[in-house]
Amino acid sequence: MIRKVFFALVGCLLLGQSAQAALDIVITGGIDSARPIAVAPFKWEGNGQLPQDIAEVVSNDLMRSGKFKPLARGQMPQTPSTSGEINFAPWASQGVEAVVVGSIAAVGDGTYKINFELVDVLKGQLAKAQGGESNGYILDSRMATIPGAQMRQFAHRISDIVYERLTGERGAFLTRLAYVSVQQGTQFPYQLRIADYDGYNEKTLLRSREPLMSPAWSPDGSKLAYVSFENQKSEIYVQDIYTQQRSLITSFRGINGAPEWSPDGRRLAIVLSKDGSPNLYVVDVASKQLTRVTTSRVIDTEPSWMPDGQNLLFTSERGGKPQIYSVNLATGMTRRMTWEGESNQGASITPDGKIMVMVTRVQGQYRIARQDMENNALLVLTQSALDESPSVAPNGSMIIYATIYQGRKSLALVSTDGRFKAVLPTSSGEIRAPAWSPFLN
């Protein structure tokens, strides 16, 4: 897998278009181990049809996190819209730990007022039994007035709040995915796309007749770096996802590949073969100043930044087979990081620096694995035959990767503890090279 040959000829097109739910999510494992929760339908205080089923979005978000098992609406003992309407006993009898309730009201000019509360069922049951006036069982309560066009995004915001209050970790539902869609037999078979993490609000940033590869998000979520072959060779570009403006970063002879943003957003770690074997370089995005990092005679590739911004992880064949190494940018000192498995490659670190995620080869099959950075314990997370391109959510809880599902290259999810698994099948073509965005405001 490490020795990829690149070919290209001509043609690309910049554009922006939207679509709905281009990616569906099919749960394949792990939901039975999740915590039971309920998201009651939000009360609609208006005329006509509810503009957005916020409760459904929140429920699906929490389910996809792998940490929660939302109660089906048909199993709910009641449909309260405020904490005061909750009868805690029947919820507790079903094992529900917390309930989300809320309401939506139209306020004119296409705007809506949304109220919601997150309620602890056990604390509420105890408070009612003691006959007290305390509302300490209300874990969170908020109100916002928003445009109708932002209602789905606000639902993700509610999910983030609920997730953080119940787990102590920041939610990653207000995030995006970047990926390459391949539709062979069309005028522009390669398309660089972004979408909300759940597949909604998809936009195409670039259409090309030739391969597009390795999208990588800037730390502020406003730009993508990627590899394009539109000019008969590999080149690295940076493109603003809002203005569509892009700039050419490198166009050297040979390989220009694998861009990865530094934590400060000023530099890219890249792979160049302009002087022979593929080696690691760092390029300043503004000045284009280039600094060589490794001088190996074998393949060094797939750089990834450590959270400190002073070290890189990378894949190298210097030991005979692909393994993960680290290199200090100041000293140039390298250290081998992986010793288990037939080979290991494509590593990245969770934001807290505690877990290294990578592709490991087990009995000839490529699977997603994690390695504890403290004790080096390796855990294989997937059981497929050809998994690749893992990208970690900004809160470190989930990994998105490319796999083969029902004969097509698709995207899949696995939690970093391995308990939750899902696939994001595509109805046509293939999906490759996923990249999870940073947290977005």
Swiss-Prot record:
Primary location group: periplasm
Cellular location(s): Periplasm
Q: Which cellular components does GO assign to this protein?
A: periplasmic space
Q: Does the keyword Signal apply?
A: yes
List the signal peptide residues.
1-21
Q: Keyword set for this entry?
A: Cell cycle, Cell division, Periplasm, Signal
Q: What top-level branch of life does the organism fall under? A: Bacteria
Kindly list the biological process annotations in GO that this record carries: cell division; protein import
Name the PANTHER family on file: PROTEIN TOLB, PROTEIN TOLB HOMOLOG
Q: Whom does it interact with, and what assembly results?
A: The Tol-Pal system is composed of five core proteins: the inner membrane proteins TolA, TolQ and TolR, the periplasmic protein TolB and the outer membrane protein Pal. They form a network linking the inner and outer membranes and the peptidoglycan layer.
State the family it belongs to.
Belongs to the TolB family.
Question: What is the protein named?
Answer: Tol-Pal system protein TolB
Gene name for this UniProt entry: tolB
